[in-house]
């Protein structure tokens, strides 16, 4: 069925917007989110925030605003509203690679990271979680996933919240995109 923003963009933007809100709720840094959403879960090294910098924050904002306007009955409608830090980044034209700064900024040989609370760039901080340490010798992403979602630290909390909301949102999209789930 025809749906606003195509299903891939709809789910992808939901995932990123959900993360944006979760970052503030859980007090996570840009580096922590990129550590949690990169290769450890089978995604590219660019993870979340670096990928947004490459694609362009303006592109993400355009699609998110389109979903917000065109999907008024979506149960996650309010989640598609942009958080204040994204609005400030747009005002400052911190769109990512195309403007030389976004969530990350290169100064000489140094890569700086945007602090989402102060909106000031600072030196990169190494992200570390006990749960991630437990997965270092586990090769298959599905086996790592089992360890990640049972973690007893902030990373475990992050994965449980993040994946539960993503799986629920994807499941709720099924009747919207198809009447025949198994064809």
Predicted regions, residues:
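N-terminal glycine-rich phosphate-binding loop for ADP-containing cofactors
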Residues: 1-183
């Amino acid at each position: 069925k025809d749906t606003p923003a195509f299903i891939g963009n709809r789910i992808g933007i939901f995932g990123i917007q959900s993360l944006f809100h979760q970052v503030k709720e859980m007090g996570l840094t840009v580096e922590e989110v990129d550590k949690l959403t990169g290769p450890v879960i089978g995604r590219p090294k660019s993870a979340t925030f670096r990928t947004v910098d490459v694609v362009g924050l303006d592109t993400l904002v355009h699609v998110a605003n389109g979903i917000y306007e065109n999907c008024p009955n979506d149960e996650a409608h309010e989640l598609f509203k942009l958080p204040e830090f994204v609005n400030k980044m747009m005002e400052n034209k911190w769109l990512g690679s195309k403007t030389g700064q976004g969530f990350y900024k290169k100064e000489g040989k140094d890569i700086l990271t945007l602090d989402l609370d102060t909106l000031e760039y600072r030196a990169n901080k190494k992200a570390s979680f006990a749960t991630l340490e437990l997965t270092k010798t586990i090769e298959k992403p599905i086996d790592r996933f089992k360890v990640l979602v049972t973690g007893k630290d902030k990373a475990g909390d992050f994965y449980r919240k993040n994946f539960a909301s993503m799986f629920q949102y994807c499941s709720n999209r099924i009747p919207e995109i198809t009447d025949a789930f198994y064809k």
